[in-house]
Amino acid sequence: MSNGNIVQCIGPVVDIQFPRDKMPNIYDALTLVESGEKSFAEKGLTFEVQQQIGDGVVRAIAMGASDGLRRGMEVKSTGKPISVPVGPATLGRIMDVLGRPIDDAGPIATEERRAIHQPAPKFDELSPSVDLLETGIKVIDLVCPFAKGGKVGLFGGAGVGKTVNMMELINNIAKQHSGLSVFAGVGERTREGNDFYHEMKESNVIDKVAMVFGQMNEPPGNRLRVALTGLTMAEAFRDEGRDILFFVDNIYRYTLAGTEVSALLGRMPSAVGYQPTLAEEMGKLQERITSTKTGSVTSIQAVYVPADDLTDPSPATTFLHLDSTVVLSRDIAALGIYPAVDPLDSTSRQLDPQVVGQEHYEVARDVQMTLQRYKELRDIIAILGMDELSPEDKLAVSRARKIQRFLSQPFHVAEVFTGSPGKYVPLKETIRGFKMICSGELDHLPEQAFYMVGSIDEAIEKAKKL
């Protein structure tokens, strides 16, 4: 272990000079040595080495506010990467990027710690799975089903409901699921983290969830590493042979923190100002989120889409790593249909007759074909009106509008502001309902009957009252 001194501070990026023969390695953790002088710098502030500049100088990034730092302050090398507590003691607790508790419930009682930088599992250790994970959300179960041990991305612009969808998935899966969950809040609003904590507490599943937060107000170092902290805790449970749910809100902020750090480290930006190492950073994180022969990790990640542009480098790089993509659309949200999932844009590798079965596959494809036909006819309807359509097209449009409304569903987590109780719809019911609409059994019912209901029987009941 060696000590060095700060020679330059540029925001969260700090240059520290060590003796030439005792330079710390890349990703080693450094800590600020407490001196007797008065300073308002955070006590024991941690840094992570990012670059070795030469001549004993390393460039590090502060894992906390760099206020109060100045040249000449002493810094100690720990000789190992940042490590965080793992294991059962983390359950029910809220931690920061360094694994320190931030819930005022005392220290975390575990000796077991693990470095946040780990290699991804080897190719022969991976275990693909084809078991479906039922979510109880009609549109997801029908057109973009999730796999146990798979990776799911929720893509959407600002304010179309990524976090609400994620909370509903947590509500439906984590509460039904007997295993453990890890939630990583990466650069999101503190209020959402707070809501999540209380939601878990009220439903008595808090002792099955470990929470790690590095929110919007934190320096970029925290936001860049907090996803790895959460992932390390999830990996530790997986390696014990458990089935884990890993939630990340929001992957885009992880990329954004990387962009901030990259610019401060003096790297040349690449497309749209992102860091040149974007694909590698994303790969390092995503390749570790995987199921092995010992245990599974099912991950659900919210991905913010800047300016609703799915071709932006950040969401585009994320797409490559996912099994299912749930795309939330502003146009559908504008119609008042929630969850605002676009059934034509969302995809899943699981939607294959050999995995979901022939009936499910055919119903899903019928639904998509009907909606696609309606999409093509919209321009004609806008110019000439419905009367100019052929009888077959009129029928297709009327069915498509019923399908569109039947894809909406009241959420448990939105009960507070919608006033209608949430519905969990089993997969069999979902398939039966859409099959009835597509086959024409319900052509006589008004389309309003299908809006914001659970199963098809509720729609039929609602039609009687209209």
Swiss-Prot record:
Gene name of the encoded protein: atpD
An annotated Gene Ontology molecular function: ATP hydrolysis activity
Major place of residence: membrane
UniProt name for this protein: ATP synthase subunit beta
CDD domains: ATP-synt_F1_beta_C, ATP-synt_F1_beta_N, F1-ATPase_beta_CD
Membrane topology value: Peripheral membrane protein
Binding partners and assembly: F-type ATPases have 2 components, CF(1) - the catalytic core - and CF(0) - the membrane proton channel. CF(1) has five subunits: alpha(3), beta(3), gamma(1), delta(1), epsilon(1). CF(0) has three main subunits: a(1), b(2) and c(9-12). The alpha and beta chains form an alternating ring which encloses part of the gamma chain. CF(1) is attached to CF(0) by a central stalk formed by the gamma and epsilon chains, while a peripheral stalk is formed by the delta and b chains.
SMART domains: AAA
